[in-house]
Amino acid sequence: MQIQIKNIVLTALFGLMLTGCASTANNDPLEGFNRGVYKFNDVADKAVIKPVAGAYKAVLPSPVRSGVNNFFDNLGTFVSVINDLLQFKFDKAVEGAGRFVINSTFGVAGLVDVASMDGIEKRKEDFGQTLGHWGVGSGPYLVLPFLGPSSIRDATGLAVDTLAFDPVVYVDDPATRNSAVALRMLDRRAQLLPGSDLLDEAALDPYAFMRDAYMQRRHHQIHDGNPPALDDEYDFD
């Protein structure tokens, strides 16, 4: 555990250092690298990930897939509650904790989203949003292998969430833990199947479209749906 905490701290500090050194005039200084990773992800997705996700969707009936999605969403609520606390959003943290308890008990370990039926809002907060909430800039845009769009700040946040806050990481058995991670990623990809081809068809430059959409979406999320006007931090010209 001490080694794990040390790794988390080092990852966070390294990410924050890079964020602090980033230029705000052009937030895609890594574009050459990013486009290479984007192309790799696209090839891997079309060759392997998308077909497997399609088979997953075809084989499992909708109620089963909904249960899987609800289960992992419920685990994600735990991560959101921690980040709400770190952002001092105590009312949202209490609401999220109540949602987690309701779904974990009456929802049969989260397989059924009872809380949404009761009108309790589903929210998602992560450590990248927490850093943004406290004024940490996004840093350069970054495309992660297999994971897709991110930024230096959000990649740092993802590392902290994954290594410290995600309940799955505390599963002792490696086979069970890795299977849970793989199933969660497969479920998320299966949900995106209906819109998989729209990006290539609609955008002249899918990479630039994805980058701009991601950065604007994160700006919106960090400000809880009421963001100030975008400044030159998001100017990619």
Indicate where each model-derived feature is located:
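Bacterial N-terminal signal peptides that target proteins for export
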Residues: M1-L10
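C-terminal motif of bacterial Sec signal peptides marking the signal peptidase cleavage site
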Residues: M17-G20
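A structured, mid-to-C-terminal "fold-capping" secondary-structure block
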Residues: A22, Q129, W134-D237
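Post-signal peptide N-terminal segment of mature Sec-exported envelope proteins
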Residues: P29-V59, D73
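Alpha-helical transmembrane segments of multipass membrane proteins
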Residues: P51-A55, V81-I82, L142
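A glycine-rich, hydrophobic loop/mini-helix early in the fold
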Residues: S62-F88
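Surface-exposed patches in mature extracellular/periplasmic domains of secreted proteins
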Residues: V64-G67, Q87-V94, S116-M117, Q221-P227
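Mid-length scaffold segments of soluble, non-membrane domains
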Residues: N74, L86-I152
